[in-house]
Amino acid sequence: MRILGIDPGLRLTGFGLIEQTGQKLAYVASGVVKSGEGSLPARLGILFGGINEVIATYRPDTCAVEIVFVNVNPQSTLLLGQARGAAICAAVSNDLTVAEYTALQIKQAVVGHGKAAKTQVQEMVKRLLALPIAPTADAADALACAITHAHGSRLGAQSTAGYRLKGGRLV
């Protein structure tokens, strides 16, 4: 099964793809979609198009997205939520099932505790996928989200049951 992990952001949205065969995980690709400058609708359109392009290129079977945390600045939280929505819409428009995980769940699944630093997540992603160098922070977070889904489909089935989307509908 090929899993697309997404770490949403308005300026940079990280993506990471892994292939799961039984218990074995293999790295496929990772990177970021940059929205650049411009109006909010234009930037969201770039993110939507970029994730669509990733899906068309790598043909994942399912998608895992990090859930937005509530920031001190409500405006930032709203903008991040819109970027996340653009990524989810891209996945759903390509008939992918979407599972959602909190940052705490991702860190626990990949590092072993929920208060892990970004550098710890990067290092564990590097080790788990046998990469020569650690991926960038955004790509590592996306790969960690995909790894969480692969390792924790049982975790995700319970923790995100009310948030799964298929064909644009909650399942």
Swiss-Prot record:
Annotated coiled-coil segments of the chain: none
GO molecular function, one term: DNA binding
Classification lineage: Bacteria, Pseudomonadati, Pseudomonadota, Betaproteobacteria, Nitrosomonadales
This protein's record includes keyword Magnesium: yes
GO cellular component, one term: Holliday junction resolvase complex
Record family assignment: Belongs to the RuvC family.
Species name: Thiobacillus denitrificans (strain ATCC 25259 / T1)
Active site: 7, 66, 138
Main localization (coarse): cytoplasm
Subunit structure comment from the entry: Homodimer which binds Holliday junction (HJ) DNA. The HJ becomes 2-fold symmetrical on binding to RuvC with unstacked arms; it has a different conformation from HJ DNA in complex with RuvA. In the full resolvosome a probable DNA-RuvA(4)-RuvB(12)-RuvC(2) complex forms which resolves the HJ.
Superkingdom: Bacteria
Binding-site residues, Mg(2+) 1: 7, 138
Sites where the protein binds Mg(2+) 2: 66
Stretches that traverse the bilayer: none
PANTHER family: CROSSOVER JUNCTION ENDODEOXYRIBONUCLEASE RUVC (PTHR30194:SF3)
Keywords associated with the record: Cytoplasm, DNA damage, DNA recombination, DNA repair, DNA-binding, Endonuclease, Hydrolase, Magnesium, Metal-binding, Nuclease
GO terms, biological process: DNA recombination; DNA repair
Its EC number(s): 3.1.21.10
Localization per Swiss-Prot or TrEMBL: Cytoplasm
InterPro entries (UniProt xref): RNaseH-like_sf, RNaseH_sf, X-over_junc_endoDNase_Mg_BS, X-over_junc_endoDNase_RuvC
Protein name (database record): Crossover junction endodeoxyribonuclease RuvC
